[in-house]
Amino acid sequence: MDLISVLPSASKSCVCLHKPLSSSTHKLKPFCRTIRILGMPRPRKSVLMVSSMSISVNTLVSDDAVQRRTGGYHSNLWNDDVIQFLSTPYGELAYRERAERLIDEVRNIFNSMSLEDGEFSDLIIQRLWMVDNVERLGIDRHFKNEIKSALDYVYSYWSQKGIGCGTKSIITDLNSTALGFRTLRLHGYPVSADVLKHFRNQIGQFVSCPSETEEDIRSMVNLYRASLIAFPGEEVMEEAESFSEKYLKETLQKIPDCSLSREIGDVLEHGWHTNLPRFEARNYIDVFGQDTKNMESNRKTEKLLELAKLEFNIFQSIQKTELESLLRWWNDSGSPQITFTRHRHVEYYTLASCIAFEPQHSGFRLGFAKACHIITVLDDMYDLFGTVEELKLFTAAIKRWDPSATDCLPQYMKGIYMMVYNTVNEMSAEAQKAQGRDTLNYARQAWEVYLDSYVQEAKWIATGYLPTFEEYLENGKVSSGHRVSALQPMLTMDIPFPPHILKEVDFPSNLNDLACAILRLRGDTRCYQEDRARGEETSCISCYMKDNPGATEEDALNHLNVMISGVIKELNWELLKPDSSVPISSKKINFDITRAFHYGYKYRDGYSVSSVETKSLVMRTLLEPVPL
């Protein structure tokens, strides 16, 4: 199919001089041909009435007599007034100074861990407890050196059978070993999952202690948390996950409502791959503050809790300023006038804030929100609103990267084109400051390939073609938008991404491929029914059923869930594999973006229907301060 076709009444020429940066699978034919493109009036507005839990498809007839589909999405939940009238006192100097004093006090706690009541103490579990808690409370960025020193100490006593509470412990214990294994693996230490085999019985099964003390229960909590950091082929980790999950669910039915039961509930519900660091910190602050054992047995932990609360609230004052900037961009870009799309810029900003809440990463947070908003607009335009011919024109215009290319576009596309053009250029300028080199052409190539994948899907929809599962997934990994959502925001960070590192994090790396696969697979399992109602038959589910005659939707979903589980383990390996030439810190942000998207699809399409879990995330981490 020609990407550009000559319209019947051609009389006016549209000349575009620039050449595309990339040639993708879906080749563009020369754009410089005589085409008459009349500016299309903006379509008449339609009033879409939907409940917060459902999505309907609407068809409207625009002023050009073209029938266009809209998704029936609910409107923006966060108008300007909600954001502009946010107030917080935690930006004041007094709070920051108090936080700095607490940081010094907590650092002293780290440094004094070798002394207890004036005498030498070699408790390994004490060091692990401290590291684990500052990470779960979201304050670990202040203690990188102290954390490394503590974990180096723990690892120096690590054995094939694990560790005990202290260096002189003759018998290893499950709680120390499970927590130690998890923490060491997450920090890149080469620890084998085989260490858990020593906690199985003679017939190779994990067993629980009949006493079921709090210590026994915490051992199972840490075993479950450890089991989620599995690599491919680690059967003992699968066994540990199955056993500990069953144990914890049964335990919840027995114990009273308390801090431990809340901790178990949070761990079971959010695991690791959908437990965003700032969201985890907000939930754990409540749990940690209610744990009377922590507060009474060691008053030093009060410092941890106070610092965590202050840090959380101080960051909200930063978020308010950034949100005001994001709203200005959203309004200035003409986004409010794009009536056919979902407006989820505040939700996307919240996701970014939950995975990168260091103050200096403002460029990442704003860039991610802007990139995701653009991706959403393009997704709705290519999937629903635009005609195939219009979409071909838009894709070709993007490849020319010249504002004059808008002369060739329908009226409703002109503003969208300029939003993409200006924002990508602005993010490239930010990336150049951070990375010391021009990355615009590199970013443009990513956007071109991304739009090519959309054109392919638009052709499938227009012709009613149902591809094979493999064909669909390969294209779908690109059209998921993961790469373009991550690339430019990532480059604005204070993390070096020289070319040899970037190719191991971005395309064509296995890390990027797996991240894109998870987003496509999980997204399809949550969206396929609504997409079908909108006339989009193509999904992982339908393609799998085509390839496997007789397979039901349930069969397809089961297959995809097994695939997702395997991809997650592979992604764990790509992030944490020992002796990698790429630092974990360079890979972590792309990995965490995967976690953010995974969170949005945990129960439903949380981007189309953002009025449930996603709304709660905004309220908990963005709008509501923690009581001091």
Curated annotation (Swiss-Prot):
GO terms for MF: magnesium ion binding; pinene synthase activity; terpene synthase activity
Keyword set, alphabetical order: Chloroplast, Lyase, Magnesium, Metal-binding, Plastid, Transit peptide
Residues binding Mg(2+) 1, per UniProt: 379, 383
Cofactor info, note text: Binds 3 Mg(2+) or Mn(2+) ions per subunit.
Binding site for Mg(2+) 2: 379, 383
Motif (DDXXD motif): 379-383
Signal peptide: none
Pathway listed: Terpene metabolism; oleoresin biosynthesis; Secondary metabolite biosynthesis; terpenoid biosynthesis
Catalyses which reaction(s): (2E)-geranyl diphosphate = (1S,5S)-beta-pinene + diphosphate; (2E)-geranyl diphosphate = (1S,5S)-alpha-pinene + diphosphate
Family recorded in the similarity comment: Belongs to the terpene synthase family. Tpsd subfamily.
Name this polypeptide is given: (-)-beta-pinene synthase 1, chloroplastic
Organism: Pinus banksiana
Designated gene of the protein: TPS-(-)Bpin1
